[in-house]
């Protein structure tokens, strides 16, 4: 049976792993129950994503995260969009931590009204079961304006197959489709997936989306904080996708006060992705050698960046 947690009144007693987020200017201290810290989204990444989301037309209503973990991402969405939120988490300790973390962000960033805090709710329960959760929310059936899903993946998996995700995408889509608002551009959904997905798996995700929302715009987004790795791979859908733009690369700078670098473009995902063939060219005076982010290469947009930046004058 789902259990309701109210962030306005939830106590932090019994919670642990209360550690500072070094990427936040405010030096927030977040709770991460049951070894949740390695899985949590850094505040700088969560905030950058929320600021990007603000550029799109998200319908009126609440923000839903049906596998909210420590609640950092959904707190960032609420803080930037000024919307109430619904966070669902199967693990009770993490659900409680999410509620307390949300209250921390709300109070320390100095919101003047308690309405958003009062109207937000966290639930210990199965994030797939929209029909069980909706009666607890006292909302109209189409009140979900935006769905965020970051399914858990096995830590020791190298492949991160779609069948290993929990909850699975089709189960969440089926459980929540009746309650998600749809504009002329489709639903506003963000799927935060494993950076290890192959191009074939990415196409599998796209096909799954098409089963529930045909002809929906899709923009794959690779996010990096450097260090030679892809930090996040997400699929932005419908109302929050870039029309006719299949790919986006986002580089989060080390300085949390600096804006991210964003590059749009690329080709639709293909099962056999094009590979960059090495070019053996004798360097000429005035040519450039570029050392670029590995995630930019992974996104398939390295040539887009090079052509835009150097107009072809590179080795």
Task: Give each language-model segment a name.
Residues 1-61, 93-141:
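S-adenosyl-L-methionine
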Residues 60-69:
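Conserved class I S-adenosyl-L-methionine
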Residues 84-89:
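Conserved SAM-binding motif I beta-strand of class I
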